[in-house]
From Swiss-Prot:
SUPFAM superfamilies per the UniProt record, alphabetical: Adenine nucleotide alpha hydrolases-like, THUMP domain-like
Pathway of action: Cofactor biosynthesis; thiamine diphosphate biosynthesis
A biological-process GO annotation: thiamine diphosphate biosynthetic process
Enzyme class: transferase
UniProt entry tagged with the keyword Oxidoreductase: no
Protein's name in the database: Probable tRNA sulfurtransferase
Sequence similarity: Belongs to the ThiI family.
Chain's role: Catalyzes the ATP-dependent transfer of a sulfur to tRNA to produce 4-thiouridine in position 8 of tRNAs, which functions as a near-UV photosensor. Also catalyzes the transfer of sulfur to the sulfur carrier protein ThiS, forming ThiS-thiocarboxylate. This is a step in the synthesis of thiazole, in the thiamine biosynthesis pathway. The sulfur is donated as persulfide by IscS.
A GO term from the CC aspect: cytosol
Primary location recorded for the protein, binned into one broad class: cytoplasm
Ranges for domain THUMP: 52-154
Amino acid sequence: MPLIALTPSGEIAIKSSRSRRRFERILIKNIGKVIRVKSYKLDQGIIILNTDDDYSKLSKVFGISKYFEVYEFSFSSIQDIVNFVKDRFNQTVKGKKFAVKVKRVGNHSFNSMDVAREIGNALYPYSLGVDLENPDVKINLILRQDYGYVYTTENDGPRGFPVGSTGKTVVLFSGGFDSPVATWMLMKRGVRPILLNFELGGKVQRDLVLKEVDVLKQWSSNNDINVYFINGLDVTSKLVNAEPSLRILLLKRIMYNTARVLANKLRAYSITTGESLSQVSSQTMINLYVTEYDIDLPVFRPLIGFDKEEIIQMSRKIGTFEYSSKLPEYCVISNKSIVKSQLDKVLEEERKIEINYEELIKKAELVRI
């Protein structure tokens, strides 16, 4: 019965042994939340899983570079290796061109080229020949001192770091194209997201947001994703007397400050947004500066250099496009905008607004996905 082998992402592999072990432990724990693992072992940079579950789910587990189905065997001579591979793969290469690649660790009376050559000679009569550049079948061997693994097909993982390995962030999550993609990108870096949504579109918006979160949950290694819903209409009602051209920036500052308070409460050490430089008037460089002024947490904007088409393409890859494309834009507070705001004027208007952020969070509805 085959086993499943996987290689952690290259960024994990190059870390110190102590850090690497920590990331590997979290990765293995996350894998166990996605598929049933009967047992596992760490083998010189490779994780070997014994599972009878659908291992294709590993394609959405961050921290994995490659995963593949392997056959394990023991040997005491080069002929033992050749016999095992010949018996296992003689029908696989039938009518096809093949190549053999060998990686070897240990002290042996033979080298990797010897093994590849002998296996090639043994399989040649069953095949259409050897093609080292573009084979139909590539037979890969990983050899240790007296045992090894053999496999033919590698599958790509999403790489990155395991979700939950690098901290938490509060995401300003509107549910449009941008914020789900930004969330996914932080998850790829090992971050566990806490989503903060200001409801401006009622049940339609909420239902679509929750469907997007269901998609993101597939990438979270089944770690819970918490969504805090805040009544956005209660917030916008406080802006009716504010300068119309500054209302959008004032609303964004309220969102940032709410995220800051929530982050401090939940021991998250950053805020994440889906903002892209100059995509809209509120996202010019000066307006981003004004928006995050005096926010004492790092603000991550993973999409800052992406254009809208690139973001939409990523949403298709992730799986959130279907729901993001149905979400209307809610512009309920002002038809005016300003591309170059003045900090002192924004702060002057802000001082006129009375908001108790602790109370705002206390009234928020928490949905755990």
